Amino acid sequence: MASRFPKFSQGLSQDPTTRRIWFGIATAHDFESHDNITEERLYQKIFASHFGQLAIIFLWTSGNLFHVAWQGNFEAWVQDPLHVRPIAHAIWDPHFGEPAVEAFTRGGALGPVNIAYSGVYQWWYTIGLRTIQDLYIGALFLLFLAAVFLIAGWLHLQPKWKPSVSWFKNAESRLNHHLSGLFGVSSLAWAGHLIHVAIPESRGEHVRWDNLLTALPHPQGLKPFFEGQWGIYAENADSSSHLFSTSQGAGTAILTFIGGFHPQTQSLWLTDIAHHHLAIAVVFIIAGHMYRTNFGIGHSIKEILETHTPPGGRLGRGHKGLYDTINNSLHFQLGLALASTGVITSLVAQHMYSLPSYAYIAQDFTTQAALYTHHQYIAGFIMTGAFAHGAIFFIRDYNPEQNKDNVLARMLEHKEAIISHLSWASLFLGFHTLGLYVHNDVMLAFGTPEKQILIEPVFAQWIQSAHGKTLYGFDLLLSSADSPAFNAGQSIWLPGWLDAINNNSNSLFLTIGPGDFLVHHAIALGLHTTTLILVKGALDARGSKLMPDKKEFGYSFPCDGPGRGGTCDISAWDAFYLAVFWMLNTIGWVTFYWHWKHITLWQGNVAQFNESSTYLMGWLRDYLWLNSSQLINGYNPFGMNSLSVWAWMFLFGHLVWATGFMFLISWRGYWQELIETLTWAHERTPLANLVRWRDKPVALSIVQARLVGLTHFSVGYIFTYAAFLIASTSGKFG
């Protein structure tokens, strides 16, 4: 008999019901649970899959370059970045009638096209690409890289090239290589590209392979470097009247510390960016020589951790036992990696708009909104994943003997205190914030807006002032003309910073008031509640007073039958599942806030946000309803417009979202009865009953249905908001 899916589980492949298919898909990537898995094969499979992942990323980015080169308008956009709309790719759709073809033929194209809201045009322009040929060369190079990585992945699965477990567990060597090689050398290479290609291009000098070795990035070459006169590289920076991509007003500096933004492009100075990457490179290349490997010099991570015992003994045995615990647990390592990547992704969202590094991207409002929202949602999923794998670590990999009285054991021992404090913070934030919003709502409804409770965010304003924002009248640090920091800043470092922070046309340190204070606390409520659910899920994953033997049931179980009185909904997976809803809603509030604040800033009517954001009806009426009205009107009796695709996606997103509830609200028995009825009907219907099934149809398990419901909820939620965001922004600003 031919082997059936899934090959990795003999038991499951013999299941006579449709559970075989769904459970097979669900456990396909849980390598640890597969038949005949050894630690060595586990590590090798994961290692090989990393090469596949990188190949997919390179193929995808190659596709972006290729489609823009083939169907885009890059060269036309380069001539006039502020007025030509960048084209992502053409649309071929046989359903398009004349009105649709007309509506979607934009950006100087000959037929229907999609506009690019990803910022790739601005990115490629900033790093020195100027022609379609440049894009094609980039696409081919990335395609070649993808092939190299696929071959490397295959190679590392061959017996001769398979790394051993000891190689995977050599933490010091890996850290050295990742710090020096991955971060350090790649940052150095990027600084090199900026200095040799991007900065000359921004000054109208075209550097390509034919003149790379003959075009000097700086008139004095390497002489100042070897003489230690490094300051020469910062002299004669681009002037404030510099026209980007031309020599007019251009300087010769390559490494500067100007601060603020280029007046024309509204983006960070390229010479500042090159300086930043060079500094990062130096720091990380040094950091990558810190850990002890074959040469007997440098730090041993294990020794550092073992030595970390808190003074006075009040905090137990500190980090003792952590080295082996982390080094032997892939889930712990993945949890740490996801936690840091999640934070970094959220920081990227924050910095891409407040300190834009790509030329003209700050004036492309729809792209700014799309990139912020995209990175915040990605960050949310990655961060919840960190806690999920933290919980799996506690269930599968945590060994109480190895971690006696260290920080991990102590976290578990006083989990009640941690969870109850988080609970208190969430309750406090929720009741007070909602109380203020509802009070203000009632005052507006009764026609007495002056009775609203409006709280100025004085601490946040004080922090903004310390950084140089003079508007609030706090006279301190960088906002005080008498402070040493202010005086030093004029000449030595960041002279452009103070101009930028006090200029109302950018998004650096936005002016804040009572509306910001309220929504800030609403977001804090969401963050704390999400964290509460996730932390509780991980800390209770091994067991709780209610269910001390929980870890024996694994990561995801529905219940332990009716006999134990309430063991449903308490698996670590359930905590993750509930937290994702809170995460999505929290990021909803974050993106609503960001988008409304910026729409009013870009339209020049900040008063609308300031006045309407202090009560709930303001948010519902003046943000959601007002900005979705165009969307709902994408199709009408008078034809269609270029927003109609977003109108359709807005409707479709709601549909997908609502479908989620079908899986979330009704339980398994209902579906099992329905399936049995349909099966009965099928078997008794002529012609239909000629078609038989190999697997007996059964309903999804409770956990599987929750996953399907959660996926529909998440996808629908994001589709709906994406359509709303892009249509409402592009409808206003083009």
Curated annotation (Swiss-Prot):
Q: Cellular location of this protein?
A: Plastid, Chloroplast thylakoid membrane
Binding positions (chlorophyll a B1): 654
* Co-factor remark: P700 is a chlorophyll a/chlorophyll a' dimer, A0 is one or more chlorophyll a, A1 is one or both phylloquinones and FX is a shared 4Fe-4S iron-sulfur center.
Q: Which GO terms describe its cellular component?
A: chloroplast thylakoid membrane; photosystem I
Molecular functions (GO terms): 4 iron, 4 sulfur cluster binding; chlorophyll binding; electron transfer activity; magnesium ion binding; oxidoreductase activity
Q: Where are the transmembrane segments?
A: 46-69, 135-158, 175-199, 273-291, 330-353, 369-395, 417-439, 517-535, 575-596, 643-665, 707-727
Per UniProt, phylloquinone binds at: 671
Membrane topology summary: Multi-pass membrane protein
Q: What does this protein do?
A: PsaA and PsaB bind P700, the primary electron donor of photosystem I (PSI), as well as the electron acceptors A0, A1 and FX. PSI is a plastocyanin-ferredoxin oxidoreductase, converting photonic excitation into a charge separation, which transfers an electron from the donor P700 chlorophyll pair to the spectroscopically characterized acceptors A0, A1, FX, FA and FB in turn. Oxidized P700 is reduced on the lumenal side of the thylakoid membrane by plastocyanin.
Q: Which family does it belong to?
A: Belongs to the PsaA/PsaB family.
HAMAP family per record: PSI_PsaB
Q: What is this protein called?
A: Photosystem I P700 chlorophyll a apoprotein A2
Tell me the organism.
Anthoceros angustus
Lineage of the source organism? Eukaryota, Viridiplantae, Streptophyta, Embryophyta, Anthocerotophyta
